Design a protein with these regions (language model features):
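A conserved helix-loop-beta module that forms one wall/lid of the active-site cleft
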Residues: 43, 49-63
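Active-site core segments that coordinate phosphate-bearing ligands/cofactors
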Residues: 1-8, 14-20, 33-43, 47-48, ...
């Protein structure tokens, strides 16, 4: 009841630097509150869990939002830079940076988790996609990354952690 605005972590840092409250599309799409077709906060979902949709600021696309730093930030840093939104979600940035010019490329981003996906112009909302564990996240240029989370390096990381506890080093 006391909150007036909800910001994702990258957007919160942007707010601290500029005083502007916006919600960058790719990171906003990961929270489960964004209507994948309309690309804005889904008031039906939010109302069911007791959150007001007006708490979420306007969605901005990566690269479409540029605002100067706050005067005190400029003075402290000596910078005349502006903040420009980028794909804040790491997967969206990784997919954007992948060296492929093919429209039908499949991407695999690996770390603790691995995420496999394709770029699409529209969300895939079929029962079949849901049954197979695919989800739609925001991508660069207002596109959709149709993704599936798959096992990454977590098993290897946990195995190494356990072996280290046992005094073994590999």
């Amino acid at each position: 009841d006391n909150a007036s605005c909800a910001l994702w972590t990258p957007d919160l840092f942007g707010y601290f630097l500029t005083g502007e409250r916006v919600s960058e599309y790719t990171i906003a799409s990961t929270g489960g509150f964004l209507d994948a077709c309309r690309r804005k906060a889904d008031s039906d979902i939010l109302s069911k869990i007791g959150i007001r949709a007006d708490m979420f600021p306007d969605i901005v696309m990566p690269g479409d939002f540029s605002v100067p730093l706050l005067p005190e930030i400029k003075e402290y840093t000596g910078s005349k830079a502006s903040l420009v939104t980028v794909p804040s979600h790491d997967t969206a940035s990784a997919f954007l940076a992948a060296p492929s010019s093919s429209e039908d490329a499949i991407f695999l981003s690996s770390g603790t988790w691995s995420i496999m996906g394709v770029m699409a112009d529209e969300p895939v909302l079929s029962a079949e996609a849901m049954e197979h564990g695919f989800s739609n996240e925001g991508g660069a240029f207002g596109r959709i990354t149709l993704i599936k989370n798959i096992m990454g390096l977590w098993i290897e990381q946990e195995s190494r952690r356990q072996w280290k506890r046992e005094g073994k080093s590999y």
